Amino acid sequence: MSLELSKFSVINRQGQNLFTPVDFVIAKGVVACVMGPSGVGKSTLLNAIGGHLSSDFRIAGKLVLNAQEVTHMRVAERHIGILFQDPLLFPHLTVGDNLAFGLKAKVGDTKQRRLLVEQALDQAQLTDFYHRHPQTLSGGQQSRVALMRALLAQPQALLLDEPFSKLDLDLRHTMREFLFDQARLRLIPVLLATHEPADADAANGPLVILKPALSPAQ
């Protein structure tokens, strides 16, 4: 599995590039980082890759996932997961039911789905948390649940939009290592948007620096 961007940029309604077009490849199991000044378009880049781009923008360039061009595919067809700053768990559902949302509809019967969720909880060191509710969990525990939910969907690539920004330093380190280990174990290409050099150092992968453009698209 690999994720490849060629002359990739995002263009606004005025026909301007938000950032200088980028070219890079993320191999399977590799964590790449994208950095740049605040407001340059890191989150917009991730939304464009994941298929969540606002209608105020359009894509220029090519996006290839596992040798298949997905530039203009619908979200569901891309099989690209994304994690945000906030875990975005459903407060009215148990932890187990939150995780089950990540499973594809055709995956197993009720018993098999329950087993997959419990295995995910074990991997996240959250055994016996199935019937807990999100509001009873710490920030780090909620982040782990959100990650495992994304992984249960079996994404072919994973996008991370500053998922550690609200965690303290110790928890940030722990969660970062857990997330990177899970991605490498599953051989998923990962792109992390961050403003922290320590994240890029820990990722030890390609570093993409977004540069403001706001020039007419070619």
Where are these regions (language model features)?
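Conserved ABC ATPase signature
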Residues: 133-137, 141
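Catalytic Walker B motif of ABC-type/P-loop ATPase nucleotide-binding domains
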Residues: 158-162
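Short coil-to-helix segment of the ABC ATPase nucleotide-binding domain corresponding to the Q-loop/switch region
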Residues: 93-102
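Conserved ABC ATPase "signature" region
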Residues: 111-129, 180-181
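ABC ATPase NBD coupling module
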Residues: 68-84, 105
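A short, proline-enriched helix->beta-strand linker immediately N-terminal to the Walker B motif
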Residues: 152-156
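Hydrophobic anchor residue at the start of the ABC signature
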Residues: 147
